[in-house]
Amino acid sequence: MEKILNGTEGFVDKQPLKNFWYVVALGDDIDSNPISVKLLNEDLVIWRGFDGSLIAAAEKCPHRQAPLSHGHLENGCLVCPYHGWTFGESGKCINIPSSSDGVPIPSKAHLNTVEVIEKYGLVWLCLGEPNNPLFELKEESDSSFRRINTEVQKWKVAATRMVDNFLDITHFPYVHAGTFGAGQETKVPNISLEYLDNDFFGYRYDILAANPEEAKSTSGSNEKSVERSMTSGFNLPLTVRSTITYKSGLEHVILLLSTPIDEISSYFTFVIWRNDDFTIPADEVIAFDRAIGEEDRVMLEKLNGVMPLGKTALVNVQSDKATVEWRRQLLKLINS
């Protein structure tokens, strides 16, 4: 009954969610072989056509439901591993080897494709009709910033739990005691919600963060602690962006992407933009953020099920203002 009251029953099957973009892979993950992904409970295959463009379609061959991701590519066309049926651009079946010359290809032999784009070094899918273009990040076109991508991981936790965590700062002294949260003030000032720009809604705050040796490449400081001016905001349904500005003028922008595989597992990746001098190796820059993400994963995988969205038994306090507003907007969206 609680799930029904809170709009979370069958969360990933909610039709409105299908009309948004979700990250499923890095662009570099898709080269000379097809790959298999799962989005909102749907199994899909992605491959690169002859011209390098991406094609995404239902994973099962319409003939005998063989997994097409186990096939291979010939001149940008996907060949089924079972009977050799071949699919070209737009998922159109162009060859059935067992058919005699002149026999037409059945209309049902073609694959059902889904929308796919490549942006920010990531592969994004939309299962329905995209509501809006993908958000723009000004740092991407600013030559003073560099972009650093990280691998796409699979977490055993609902995407809703991940977003709730990424919008929260009160867990820092506890979950992140091993990285930047040690000794951090536990009391959080009253926050005000605002549009941070045209695409993200959230709040601004300042913290004094621990700056251990392994964080110094990220912070650009040798001090034991550093002042951070930060923002955290969401873009519906499941994207979070955090920005960090240091006194030196260094800016560190993190895009946190949670993609529902099913009700209880998700893809996760984060992307960083920085206006540093580009001399520090990317792996060194992101090592600290990876460690922070691992602390989150360990905690989140202890939580069960989809995050309740509506009026629930969950107790909220003033520091939860951003996550409460995100849940309110998300519930309104999925029930629209």
Give the location of each predicted region.
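A short, structural micro-pattern
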Residues: 18, 110, 117-119, 252, ...
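C-terminal catalytic domain of Rieske-type non-heme iron oxygenases
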Residues: 53, 131-336
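Short Pro/Gly-enriched beta-strand edge/turn motifs at strand-loop
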Residues: 17-26, 92-100, 173-176, 237-241
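Rieske [2Fe-2S] iron-sulfur-binding domain
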Residues: 2-3, 9-10, 23-147
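N-terminal flexible segment immediately upstream of the FAD-binding catalytic core
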Residues: 1-2, 17
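Short beta-strand or tight-loop elements
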Residues: 20-22, 42, 112, 189, ...
